[in-house]
Amino acid sequence: MPVELVDEAGRAVGACPVAEAHRDPGKLHRAFSVLLFDTAGRVLLQQRAAVKTRFPLLWANTCCGHPAPGESVEAAAATRLAEELGVAAGLTEVGVFRYRAADTATGRVEHEWDHVLIGTLDTTPHPDPAEVANLRWVRPAEVRAKLAAEPAAYTPWLAEVLEIADAAYRESAGR
C-alpha cells in the first residue's frame, strides 16, 4: 500500500510504498491517530499486535494508520476502526503534529505528519487479533502517570496524541 509523502508544511509531494517510508532514516508521510473516549471520559488504548512491524506489543492510542494518497484522513481512520476493532464512530480531527521515532527492536522508523482524531464509543469493540493484542479503557490522568513511570511500555507518539485529543475532548465536553 502506498503512503502519501508530505513536505515540512504537511503538503502532499508524492507517494511511496509503506515499507520504504519506514526504512531508516524514514520519509515524512501522512498518518492519523484516533483516540476514542467513552461517556465517562476514559480513553481506549490498544496494545499493538506482536506481528506489527513497528513498535509491536506496545500500548498506543485506539488505532492509527495511513491514508492512501489523496484519501481523506477521516475516511481512512473510519476504515481502520472497522478493520481493527469492528466499530464505527463519528470522528473529528482536532490537531496535527510531526514526530520521528526509531524502533530499535525492528529497525523501522516512524517519521509522520500525524493527524489526531477523536470520537466517542458506546459499543463493545471486537478487535482483530492480527492487529490488536489487547484493549483497555483508562482515565487520561492514569495514562499520563503510566507514561511517566513506564515509557518503554508505550509508543513514542502516544503522549502527544493524548495531550491534543484530551484537550479537545475536555473543551468539547465542557470539562
From Swiss-Prot:
It is found in: Cytoplasm. It comes from the Bacteria. InterPro entries: Idi_bact (IPR056375), IsopentenylPP_isomerase_typ1 (IPR011876), NUDIX_hydrolase-like_dom_sf (IPR015797), NUDIX_hydrolase_dom (IPR000086). Binds 1 Mg(2+) ion per subunit. The magnesium ion binds only when substrate is bound. GO terms for biological process: dimethylallyl diphosphate biosynthetic process; isopentenyl diphosphate biosynthetic process. One of its GO terms (molecular function) is isopentenyl-diphosphate delta-isomerase activity. The keyword Metal-binding applies. Residues 27-160 form the Nudix hydrolase domain. Its cofactor is Mg(2+); Mn(2+). Mg(2+) binds at residues 64, 84. Its EC number is 5.3.3.2. It is an enzyme of class 5 (isomerase). Disulfide bonds: none annotated. It catalyses: isopentenyl diphosphate = dimethylallyl diphosphate. Mn(2+) binds at residues 22, 29, 66, 110, 112. Pathway: Isoprenoid biosynthesis; dimethylallyl diphosphate biosynthesis; dimethylallyl diphosphate from isopentenyl diphosphate: step 1/1. The active site is at 64, 112. GO terms for cellular component: cytoplasm. Keywords: Cytoplasm, Isomerase, Isoprene biosynthesis, Magnesium, Manganese, Metal-binding. Belongs to the IPP isomerase type 1 family. Catalyzes the 1,3-allylic rearrangement of the homoallylic substrate isopentenyl (IPP) to its highly electrophilic allylic isomer, dimethylallyl diphosphate (DMAPP). This is Isopentenyl-diphosphate Delta-isomerase. It comes from Nocardia farcinica (strain IFM 10152). The gene is idi.
